[in-house]
A protein has these predicted regions:
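Short hydrophobic targeting helices and cationic amphipathic motifs
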Residues: 2-4
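ER/Golgi luminal nucleotide-sugar-dependent glycosyltransferases, focusing on the catalytic module
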Residues: 8-222
Length: 222
């Protein structure tokens, strides 16, 4: 049975998730939606663990059984410490397929454009996770909305990558501060020895996701 063989092949891979959560009034709803999507896609069952890096001090409820929770000490909104945890893990574990994503939009009031952007990103890295890990047999990283300037990155900072590639990233991107630091965490994915990206859905460079509600009819039939 081809489906059984495919499922067995997927389950034999080591899958790890690194998820960043900035706590505020909106983040609880985003968190619940994203965890639900991990379950319904089958990814939560397939992964070995999900590292949840939290900025904030509120107690977490409804945690997945596979969750490894870390309350970040530097209480900045950006993903720095969660990315750092992922980087250190990759240095020690070179044979994993790693998903990185975050509670996009949690640091702002509800903005329809950001909600639509998050739905778009989640569709590719969560709903289509099997395709992503298949692509990692050919490429070092997989995502959507690839941008090459000012440094190669996936706009929005949701992606999959091989941990042996993540281990080669430039760790200086972890420690810059201020607004440039937040941007550097997103740019870090392109700083490795051999950035060989797979862009699952190209979005025209003139498309500003902060101004546009990027609806599902733009991508669901891919």
């Amino acid at each position: 049975d081809l489906n059984l063989k495919s499922s067995t092949k997927i389950m034999s891979k080591k899958l790890a998730i690194f998820y960043h959560l900035y706590q505020n009034e909106l983040s609880g709803l985003i968190y619940q939606q994203q965890m639900h999507r991990l379950y319904t896609s089958g990814l939560m069952d397939a992964c070995e663990f999900i590292h949840i890096g939290i900025v904030g001090e509120a107690e977490m409820f409804s945690l997945p059984e596979k969750a490894r929770v870390q309350y970040n000490k530097r209480l900045t909104k950006d993903e720095g410490e969660t990315v750092e945890s992922m980087y250190k893990f990759s240095k020690e574990n070179p044979d994993y397929k790693v998903l990185f994503f975050h509670a996009k939009g949690a640091s702002r009031q509800f903005v329809p454009q950001l909600h639509a952007w998050r739905m778009f990103l989640e569709y590719y890295v969560i709903d289509k996770w099997r395709e992503c890990i298949d692509k990692l047999e050919e490429y070092d990283s997989v995502g959507v909305k690839l941008r090459m300037k000012p440094y190669p990155h996936y706009s929005g900072n949701f992606w999959w990558a091989n941990s042996n590639y993540l281990a080669t990233l430039d760790e200086n991107f972890l420690y810059t501060e201020g607004e440039s630091g937040k941007i550097d965490r997103e740019l870090m994915i392109g700083s490795g020895d051999r950035f060989d990206p797979c862009d699952l859905h190209h979005v025209h460079k003139e498309m500003n996701m902060y101004d546009t509600i990027f609806t599902e009819d733009n991508y669901l039939n891919d």
